[in-house]
Amino acid sequence: MENYIYGHHACIEAISMEKCLMIYLSKEGRNQTQQQVERAANARKIPIRYIPKEAFKKFTKENHQYVVALISPIEFIDMSNFIDEHSKGTEPMVVALLDGVTDVGNLGNLIRTAEFLGVNLLVVPKTGSARLTEKVIRASSGAAFSLNIAQVDHIKDAIYLLKSYDFSIYGASEKKSTSLIDVKFDRLTAVILGDESKGIKPSILGLCDQIIGIPKFGKIDSLNVSSASAILFFEIIRQHHNA
């Protein structure tokens, strides 16, 4: 099955990360945004096909900006090798694990946030989670190409592996949690984020060293997982940089 993404930002990122196999542009005139994609593709010697504007409907009915890219699939990294290589020494690490995040928009936004803030690794399960489709890649604005992502059979297996390397495991939940502002994060930190409606499964929460929550100062009761992840990632990495 061929994978297509669309839109200026996602296509530019795919080109820069050498994940783009072909670019489709309108042959009926191009604006500055499309010309930027054209120049980037030419610089990397990526083939360009110029097609009628009407033909873009076969790719998507959403706002494609008349820019579509055929991309190579997301390549997952080997979690065990990555942790073994990067956890040694004195540099801090942040690993994010997802337990049942099924909304593609939330997953894409979370990936973009994780890459922007410098999360070292994102771990997703093979089942019970949104797949890394072109919609997720677009929602991430192409950040899915540059973030280290590992796929595992079961999140529990990933937790056991991280514990064997002395990672501290934090579960994000509002139930019986310690406020984020009262937590001192360890050098090797792993944070688990759960399903948008049900949260982290009890069996997974039971493996956490500490349950943490975001303090609420307003009237709404909760945040979606992508918004919550931004706050959590920032505070963890802020502490690491100030240590």
Question: Whereabouts are the PLM-identified features?
Answer:
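Short, ordered loop/turn segments at secondary-structure junctions
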Residues: 28, 53-55, 127-129, 175, ...
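Structured adenosyl-cofactor binding patch, chiefly the S-adenosyl-L-methionine
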Residues: 12, 17, 138-143, 205-243
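Glycine- and other small-residue-rich loops at beta-strand/loop junctions that grip anionic moieties
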Residues: 3, 26, 99-100, 125, ...
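N-terminal positively charged helical leader segments and presequences
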Residues: 1-85
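Short amphipathic alpha-helix with an adjacent loop that forms part of the alpha/beta core around
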Residues: 80-88, 161-163, 181-184
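RNA substrate-binding interface of SAM-dependent RNA methyltransferases
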Residues: 19, 46, 87-176
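Active-site/ligand-binding-proximal alpha/beta "capping" segment
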Residues: 170-224
